[in-house]
Every structure is written in C-alpha cells, then in structure tokens.
Amino acid sequence: MNMRTYTNITYEKNRDIIQLMHILSNPNTSIEIYRNTFYKLGKALGALLDEKKHSRYGNTMLACASEDADWLAQGVLSSISQKNVALAVFWNQRITLDETTKLEYSPIVKSYIEPIEECQTLIVVKSIISSSCVVKTQLTRLVEKMNPLNIYILSPVMYKDAQKNLQKEFPESISNKFEFLTFAIDTSKDAQGSVLPGVGGM
C-alpha cells in the first residue's frame, strides 16, 4: 500500500497544492502540464520559505539539478522576496553501485556556479528527494566552497528516510544548518527503487 503524508499543508487551506501533487503523480499527465505543475509547486515552496525567513535572506544562492532549473527552481525564484540570488546548476550522472541495496552514486559531470561572497542562505531545490545522492553531491561541492549560515532543502516530495540519510552524510556542524521544506512524505518504493506515488516515476 502506497502511503503519503502531507506536511506544511492542509486539506482545508491548501486544496490547490494537493491537486497539483495529484497531477504530478498521474502517469498520464502531459509534459506541458507536468512542467507547469512543477513551476506552480516551486512558487508554493518559495512562499513557504518566505514565511520561514520573514524575507530576511542576506546573500543567497539557489542550487538545483539542470532538469529542475527551468520549472521548479524558476517557481521558487519567482516567489521568494529575495531577488538578488546567485545560481548554481549541476548536471549529474547517476550510477548504481549495488542493484540489491539500490546504492547510488551521482558524480557531477558539469556545473555552472555564479560567484557569491559570504553566503548566508543556501537554497537547494530538487523535484523529489529519494536516495539523497544527488543533493548530497551538490551540497558537498558547495559547502567546500562556502560556509552558508542556513541551508534550506526544498522539494515537493521526499521519501521517508531521505532527511535522516542526508543528515548522516555530513558532520553536525553542517547538518544542523539543514531545514527541509516539503509538501509530502512518501513511504513506499517499487522494485526499481522509484518512490510511490512520487512524482510520476522520477
């Protein structure tokens, strides 16, 4: 049985966001609607972040994978009150090291990173956080170059163990800065390791 728990939203106040989540998990959703749905969810995540930050960001960088740059990340950028944001975009390759345990490695094969001085807020945006390997690789690259005061990890959907597993990959001096913002926690995966209902098989 595929179990999903909604967080940061309620059926009474956020039916529009829940409807967007249903659209994402529908395998018959068209590409155009799928992309537009990610943009709208990005805007909603950005609005949630603004509530947390009270518009006090300081020097800010947004990091994302290349496949999330045009839709989800753009939605976040359009919604947050901080408009001067440095960008970091990564192209990752996913390599499965162990088929049995679904252990994965995600090396960066290309990156675009804008300069930033004294980063205070690092925002990492991902369409879904499952094994955390992509986010881990991106964060490792960035925290080596800078020492942000706050790290916000935004994703519409997260697998139930993703937060714990990502935190274990970093020393407490880094992981204590993490704050995760999501709308749904999923508890199931299929035989291929895809989160269910997830975001349509991604």
Label every PLM stretch briefly.
Residues 1-202:
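PRPP-associated nucleotide enzymes
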